[in-house]
A protein has these predicted regions:
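C-terminal accessory/binding modules appended to enzymatic or scaffolding proteins
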Residues: 102-158
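Catalytic adenosine-cofactor/nucleotide-binding cores of aminoacyl-tRNA synthetases and other
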Residues: 1-100, 104, 159-190
C-alpha cells in the first residue's frame, strides 16, 4: 500500500479515544479459536503435551483411542491446560465424583432411572453415539421424564463431572465395558 493510499483510507473518527488495554477474556476467546482451527496432528501433539504436564499418561492407551477421545474435545475448551481436567476421565479408571453434583444427580429417585438406563445400554445392538442417544431417549420416554433427567446422572457416573464432551460420543469412545463398570460403580456407591 502506498502512502497516498494510506492517506486516502485514513479516517480519524475510526480511531478509538481510549488507550489500548489488555483484555484477558478476549485472549482466552482467541486462544480457543486458535485451538479449534489447529490441524489434527498439531492439536493431538499439544493435547498430549498438556496431559503429560498434568502427569496423565496417554502413552499406555492405543493411539486410535487417544485420538478419538481428543476429537470429542475439539472446540470445547479455551486453553490446553484445561484439557486434563476436562477429559482426564478417558485415561483413568479412578473416577472422582464432583461432590455437589453427586448430591443432586445421585439422588435416591435417580438410582432406579440409572439402572434402567444401564440396562438399555447393555441391550443396545451397537454401542455408537446414535444408538446410545436413541436408547437414552427411549428410556426417558418410558420413565415419563425428560432426557436431561437421565443425561446428568449418566454423565456424572461415567466422567465424574457435570460438563464435558458430548455424552453420546464420549460413551462411544469409552466403550461398552468401561461405561457399564462406571455406571455400576456409581449405582453401588450411591
Amino acid at each position: 500500500m502506498t502512502v497516498a493510499e494510506v492517506i486516502e483510507r485514513f479516517d480519524l473518527p475510526q480511531i478509538l479515544r481510549h488507550n489500548a488495554r489488555f483484555d484477558y477474556e478476549k485472549l482466552l476467546w482467541l486462544q480457543g479459536e486458535y485451538a479449534r482451527e489447529l490441524g489434527d496432528d498439531r492439536f493431538y501433539e499439544l493435547a498430549v503435551h498438556a496431559f503429560a504436564k498434568a502427569a496423565v499418561n496417554t502413552n499406555s492407551f492405543p493411539l486410535h483411542y487417544v485420538k478419538a477421545a481428543l476429537d470429542t474435545c475439539k472446540g470445547k475448551f479455551k486453553m490446553f491446560s484445561e484439557l486434563p481436567a476436562y477429559a482426564g476421565f478417558y485415561f483413568t479408571d479412578k473416577i472422582e465424583y464432583n461432590a455437589e453434583a453427586a448430591k443432586k444427580d445421585f439422588a435416591p429417585e435417580n438410582k432406579p432411572r440409572l439402572q434402567k438406563l444401564r440396562d438399555a445400554f447393555a441391550a443396545a445392538p451397537k454401542f455408537d453415539a446414535a444408538t446410545l442417544e436413541a436408547a437414552l431417549k427411549e428410556t426417558a420416554k418410558a420413565l415419563g421424564v425428560k432426557a436431561g433427567v437421565l443425561v446428568h446422572p449418566c454423565r456424572l457416573a461415567v466422567t465424574g463431572n457435570t460438563a464435558g464432551p458430548s455424552l453420546y460420543h464420549l460413551l462411544e469412545v469409552l466403550g461398552k465395558e468401561k461405561v457399564m463398570v462406571r455406571i455400576e460403580r456409581a449405582l453401588t456407591n450411591f
